[in-house]
Amino acid sequence: MLCMAVAVMGGLASCEEHTDEYEGSLKVGNILLADNSIVSPQGYDSKNQTAVGVIFYASRDTALVVSRYELGSYAYADSLGTVGSVNSDSRTLCGAENTAALLVSEITTPAAEAVADFRSPMASWALPSAGELRALAAMLPVVAHSMEIIGGEPFADGQYISSTQDGSTSESEQMYYLSVAMPSGFVTSTIKTTPGRVRPVLRLR
């Protein structure tokens, strides 16, 4: 992996260092708008503003937004096999890096391709890593409240597909990806050809 893991709060790790462009407004539950600005739920004007998603994780060097839209249910891959350069740590915030690796893999990756085809005012959406989905689950009540305010699609109870492979063994890395349950955040090893719910995330730098 080209990315280096560094410790951040909550027992999660970030793949690389980032710089904030939104200092002062990076707060879980705040809303990302189509014009690249951020507002609080109280300051959101549905008649004059277009919401893109809701911040579900914010720290000194990383902020992550979850889309207002579900994309449906897709398989991690159409066949079994290890995808190179995909981080297999269930704690890391590496959705963007993992998605990039999936998209250039020789293995067809329907979930990552669905995210790549997602039409939005913002670019660079990713299939979230297991660590990112765990972070989302931890803050789901706050995020769901803001999502309701902006008219976003509710989060389903059940398994969401992550971009993370199960790296327990070389065999498991070939066969399984990690899915994360909402709202519990419970992580499960799932056969790569088994579909899971897809909800894109976006990293703010």
PLM regions with names:
Residues R68-L71, V180-S184:
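Secondary-structure transition/turn motif
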Residues M9, A51, A63-L64, V83, ...:
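Residue-level detector of solvent-exposed, low-hydrophobicity positions
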Residues V104, T108-W125, A130-M182, T188:
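An exposed tryptophan-centered "aromatic clamp" motif
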Residues V6-M9, T194:
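Processing junctions and N-termini across compartments
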Residues M1-L2:
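Bacterial N-terminal signal peptides that target proteins for export
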Residues G10-S14:
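C-terminal motif of bacterial Sec signal peptides marking the signal peptidase cleavage site
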